């Protein structure tokens, strides 16, 4: 999450996922080397067909902490998306699980720039300056497990981890940069 002091907005990568937890002793058994959360994802798959269970969603939301109002929101194809970076120039950056690194207008959420990077991103971007030139960098890759659970949370065919694999790498961008991203 990031904050723009000029606009007074907080940019939140939301992960809205319902989970079914069963408080029955012995129901869940720990399995070494697997995604041990205390829930059974196949039960969650079944729950997705039940009425009253909200859909799994992910978005970037611009939130006003003083009024409690969401000023704008951009929905993503999957819930597991990266952190955000907001700059003094009014741009908010975020990488998403579809493999796109996106620059949004911090005031209204308009997409200003987007780059396909062939892997999902969960890390927040950073910015730095060298010899008066500003760069934005992101550690790309699905270091967490959220994008590796596929069908259990839907939209599995639209996530970069399924389309390209999960190659981690550091990417750095600058205005006017000419380098081409190598294909993985």
For each predicted feature, which ranges?
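Long, low-complexity segments enriched in small/aliphatic residues
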Residues: 2-19
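Extracytoplasmic/lumenal domain signature
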Residues: 21-79, 85-88, 92-122, 126-184
